Amino acid sequence: MKHIRNFSIIAHIDHGKSTLSDRLIQVCGGLTDREMQKQVLDSMDIERERGITIKAQSVTLNYKANDGEIYQLNFIDTPGHVDFTYEVSRSLAACEGALLVVDAGQGVEAQTLANCYTAIEMNLEVIPVLNKIDLPQADPLRVAEEIEDIIGIDALDAVQCSAKTGVGIAEVLEMIVKDVPPPVGDKDAPLQALIIDSWFDPYQGVVSLVRIKHGELRAGDKIKIMSNDHVHTADQVGVFTPKQTNTGILRTGEVGFVIAGIKEIHGAPVGDTITHQKNAAPLRLPGFQKIKPQVYAGMFPIASDEYESFRDALNKLSLNDASLFFEPENSTALGFGFRCGFLGMLHMEIIQERLEREYDIDLITTAPTVIYEVVTKKDGTFQIDNPSDLPAVNDILEIREPIVEANILVPQEYLGSVITLCVDKRGMQTKMSYHGKQVAVTYELPMAEVVMDFFDKLKSTSRGFASLDYNFKHFQTSDMVRVDILINSERVDALAIIAHRDSAQSRGRQLADALKELIPRQMFDIAIQAAIGGHVIARTTIKQMRKNVIAKCYGGDVSRKKKLLKKQKDGKKRMKQVGNVEVPQEAFLAILKVGK
């Protein structure tokens, strides 16, 4: 056991985590040069296209250190984006140490900070690594000072490396062996294995990634899932090197996979404990706190007969992505679908893309909303995540919106424009401190403003230099209203949004104008209205198409022309009474773009 080292790699987006993982795999000979490819651990197509890590991946490598001993390194490459912090905290629970990778050109960023504090709270040994020293703008000394100043860990002897060129990788490996403590555990105690991650394989059933805390697990053992007492036989046990390799045994302190032919999707949930059927452990290991979704949206299959396969796809995805929440929903405009909860807008985009690619389902997604607390005269306080669930205006005493604490790190020259942006988004500044050339500002912002497009705007106002990390703080009373969209005097429930009263009129106007462009013209006028309760705040009209009915009249009396025009007018009137307006798919997407 003293030769095992479990560690994670944590960093801000684009600081080179996945490339560093590639180098570690290459140096330790995990894959041959022919099998090696860029970002070998980013196995999903979406990860490669976007250049981001979404799922944490684990790898076991054997490394011969300078002291002549062979060490088993189990490491987990984690995502860097703020939407996937849950993946990071889960990975850290399986480790004793963490490599904190910082770009030597850009320095410390907000997500570096957040992930590092998570690691320190879990009592992990944090090893700073300065990456990208081959870049012309790299300034390792300044960045080392920044790490000490902002995070407060000793970084003067931090390893300097370039994951791209391979410089300094050997030093990184030696630091891991020297500084990361070996795991502790009792190999003779009853088996306790923590499930860190799981996914569904169509041929093998549920594949679980586990960390053995006590005891050992062999292929052929009868194992019990402690949350539901189901008993299975461990068919295959092994590690990822990064290829799936059967070893037949996992010992105390190791990280590997177990396949037990579990066919029901939630048969071995993440955070659960596996033990032996006969010599069972008395207690479960403390799992992970259930994460609450921050953003909700309705998802509906375009073809109504795909509903069951859509449910199936969501079930399989939720096994692999424990932070996805969903429940059935029915909309008058869109039929049957699901109300889904996500950690943020990027998470929502990724899930939608994975459903369309991996499961081949075409979806319509409604406008995302956050959770609001509503206090009513009749039913007291309750939470809603869907604008159409909001009770009648005269029954509401107050609406409370969620407020987040946003920590922003920004270079001094862009501070002014970032403060302006935060004020526009109804933010309240609570803290500001200077660290060298960087400024750390803390704002309390409404979550609804942050999840929509705040991240994109922050990046564009600071030319990409500002970084953001946020977490939920509390609910606060606010003047929120529901803006309904009426098409031909009929309410379309899927187009409703909740907005602040100050911005409701402009949001309503933008929505009406966007719909005017997208809904095709009919044979009669279509009125598009935005309304709060019974009060219309914006209106626009799509003009009818009309045939020139008097083209065939040559001369003759004017009453002949009037008669034809009146006949046409009456026809249009009848048509309007019975005519239905189809709202195209693009109209629902337009809401997502409004306000950007």
From Swiss-Prot:
GTP binds at residues 14-19, 131-134. Residues 2-184 form the tr-type G domain. It is found in: Cell inner membrane. One of its GO terms (cellular component) is plasma membrane. Required for accurate and efficient protein synthesis under certain stress conditions. May act as a fidelity factor of the translation reaction, by catalyzing a one-codon backward translocation of tRNAs on improperly translocated ribosomes. Back-translocation proceeds from a post-translocation (POST) complex to a pre-translocation (PRE) complex, thus giving elongation factor G a second chance to translocate the tRNAs correctly. Binds to ribosomes in a GTP-dependent manner. It is an enzyme of class 3 (hydrolase). One of its GO terms (molecular function) is GTP binding. Its EC number is 3.6.5.n1. It is a peripheral membrane protein. Belongs to the TRAFAC class translation factor GTPase superfamily. Classic translation factor GTPase family. LepA subfamily. The lineage of its organism: Bacteria, Pseudomonadati, Pseudomonadota, Gammaproteobacteria, Alteromonadales. It catalyses: GTP + H2O = GDP + phosphate + H(+). GO terms for biological process: positive regulation of translation. Keywords: Cell inner membrane, Cell membrane, GTP-binding, Hydrolase, Membrane, Nucleotide-binding, Protein biosynthesis. This is Elongation factor 4. It comes from Pseudoalteromonas translucida (strain TAC 125). It comes from the Bacteria. Pfam families: EFG_C, GTP_EFTU, GTP_EFTU_D2, LepA_C.
